[in-house]
């Protein structure tokens, strides 16, 4: 896939977008936090309401390209941070957010780009990291102790017999 960000941007449809919009009522303005920016579906929809501001986060450095378009289109209304959503508190701080949205799960951009190493269908290296600067699965398997791998699989993989 030559340009995974453009394909994600045009093909990703956020889960339950209209239901989220209905519940959040962005037409009245406010600050909305998109903790899993990805292709920008939620952020773009919230920004259609002229009184809204969006703070968006994504740990994947490829996503920055998509965010730049929105920063240009919505100056002083769209703010992107290349960070993990677990850091949302340090980013939002004491600002009162009207809603915080998480579209959890793997991103299409990561699954569809074979170089990211999430698929067993290709001969690419095993990466499986959410961001490009993180430790790959291949590095973890080759460098972590057996005990550490068991612990990771047991806790994060919820596999009690690891």
Predicted regions and their residues:
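S-adenosyl-L-methionine-dependent methyltransferase catalytic core, i.e., the SAM/SAH-binding region
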Residues: 1-162
């Amino acid at each position: 896939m030559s340009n995974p960000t453009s394909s994600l941007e045009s093909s990703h449809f956020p889960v339950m977008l209209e239901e989220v919009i209905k519940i959040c009522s962005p037409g009245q303005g406010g600050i909305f936090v998109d903790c899993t920016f990805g292709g920008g579906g939620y952020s773009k929809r919230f920004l259609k309401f002229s009184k809204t501001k969006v703070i968006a986060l994504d740990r994947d450095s490829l996503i920055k390209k998509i965010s730049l378009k929105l920063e240009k289109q919505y100056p002083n209304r769209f703010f992107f941070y290349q960070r993990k959503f677990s850091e949302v508190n340090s980013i939002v701080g004491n600002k009162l957010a009207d809603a915080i949205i998480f579209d959890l799960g793997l991103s299409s951009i990561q699954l569809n780009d074979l170089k990211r190493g999430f698929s067993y269908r290709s001969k690419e290296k095993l990466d499986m990291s959410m961001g490009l600067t993180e430790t790959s699965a291949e590095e973890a398997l080759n460098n972590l102790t057996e005990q550490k791998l068991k612990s990771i699989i047991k806790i994060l993989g919820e596999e009690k017999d690891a």
